[in-house]
């Protein structure tokens, strides 16, 4: 049983409570729920970004996170320097980084802009660099908070294709999503979070069905299902 608490203006609140979860090779877990349910907090606890106040977490394998990708960048350093710096933070050796530098640069499509400090980059350019470096590893466990939506359409399409490849190759996938379609399409398990607790766990279709009935009512839920998910 894991608990994660954080500070608010009124003191300590429980962001996650009574979370018990075990994932094995081949598992693809969708985490769904309303805003403020604790979805992103749970993902960050899994990534060991947030410490827990009670319980334990056991992780076996290399984790890659597709959120907060800008962490670890030096705004005064050039794009090239940040590729190497971020690579080290991702657990790559200097030799491994050098083998990946060219591919990272080509994927980012930043060209000569890699020679200048990233503080001069537009938000779109920075996303290109951060994404290109963060997805250069081959993780055992992939933690993903939605899909990429920022940046120009061409790069977003290319980036989402890479994410799809990583989702297929990772031994374990954990996907936080507001898309019920993605939960069913990509995952074989799902949990519904509400107020930091697991309200429902099981097959994605069953969990999505429960969630839709909870927020919309049974009639609207059945109409929605007939139009989208259960025509597959």
Stretch-by-stretch model annotation:
Residues 209, 213-232:
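ABC ATPase nucleotide-binding domains
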Residues 186-203, 211:
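H-loop (His-switch) and adjacent beta-strand-loop-beta switch element
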Residues 32-34:
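The feature captures the beta-strand-to-loop junction immediately N-terminal to the Walker
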Residues 1, 84, 96-113, 130:
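Conserved ABC ATPase "signature" region
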Residues 177-178:
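H-loop/switch region of ABC-family ATPase nucleotide-binding domains
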